[in-house]
Amino acid sequence: MEEEEHEVYGGEIPEVGDTDVPDPDIDMSAADEDAVTELAEMKRRLKEMEEEAAALREMQAKVEKEMGATQDPASMAANQEGKEEVDARSVYVGNVDYACTPEEVQLHFQTCGTVNRVTILMDKFGQPKGFAYVEFVEVEAVQEALQLNESELHGRQLKVSPKRTNVPGMKQYHPGRFNPSMGYRFRRPFVPPYFYSPYGYGKAPRFRRPMRYMPYQ
């Protein structure tokens, strides 16, 4: 019986000095320094992100506070009172010439009192609407300005009246008043329009019954 040969190792047997063994004399401080530097950079970026988030929260809180202040009923009431006080010292001027300037309107009303502001309303295209508001410093100047109603400026008669304060959320409604000199106008009842009928006036159309099919017998 023949003996079988088994190959245990096909290469050369390495010597003891050829194996890779970590050298204990190698300095690992360089790798540690890189890790420490990277960790410090990550901490710095994280701190910057936290600071940005805090700034955004502070800005949002400030905006919400300002929005809440605008919706405060007390502040709205104060603003409304201030507007009413300004309107009490102002007049509405209608039928103003389109070529008229605020300076000319001021000169026209300066004999009534101290003019604080002249506002000529414009449309969305920047063209004058034909009326203006004149605000005085003194409340008594309003009565003097009303005396200039139907006075002429640029050849046109001005319509001067006290300025009315618009209440937010309310629409002004001016119902017609009964005038004894003009009489009361009744509304006429609705009368349907006359409808032309080809069958003649007052005659209803006559419809024939549909013919039934009768088969031959």
From Swiss-Prot:
* Skewed-composition ranges (Acidic residues): 15-28
The gene behind this protein is PABN3
Where is the region Necessary for homooligomerization? 75-216
Q: How does it assemble?
A: Monomer and homooligomer. Binds RNA as a monomer and oligomerizes when bound to poly(A). Forms a complex with cleavage and polyadenylation specificity factor (CPSF) subunits PAPS4, PABN1, PABN2, CSTF50 and FIPS5. Interacts with CSP3.
PROSITE patterns linked: RRM (PS50102)
Keywords for this protein: Coiled coil, Cytoplasm, Nucleus, RNA-binding
Which positions are tagged coiled coil? 30-71
Gene Ontology cellular-component terms listed:
nuclear speck; nucleus; plant-type vacuole
One GO MF term, please?
A: poly(A) binding
List the protein's name. Answer: Polyadenylate-binding protein 3
CDD domains linked to this entry = RRM_II_PABPs
Q: What does this protein do?
A: Involved in the 3'-end formation of mRNA precursors (pre-mRNA) by the addition of a poly(A) tail of 200-250 nt to the upstream cleavage product. Stimulates poly(A) polymerase (PAPOLA) conferring processivity on the poly(A) tail elongation reaction and also controls the poly(A) tail length. Increases the affinity of poly(A) polymerase for RNA. Binds to poly(A) and to poly(G) with high affinity. May protect the poly(A) tail from degradation.
Q: Where is this region: Disordered?
A: 1-28
Record keyword Coiled coil present: yes
Keyword flag Nucleus: yes
Where this protein primarily resides, as one coarse class? nucleus
Listed InterPro entries: Nucleotide-bd_a/b_plait_sf, RBD_domain_sf, RRM_dom
Q: Where in the cell is it found?
A: Nucleus speckle; Cytoplasm
User: What region holds the RRM domain?
Assistant: 89-165
Q: Motif (Nuclear localization signal) spans which residues?
A: 162-169
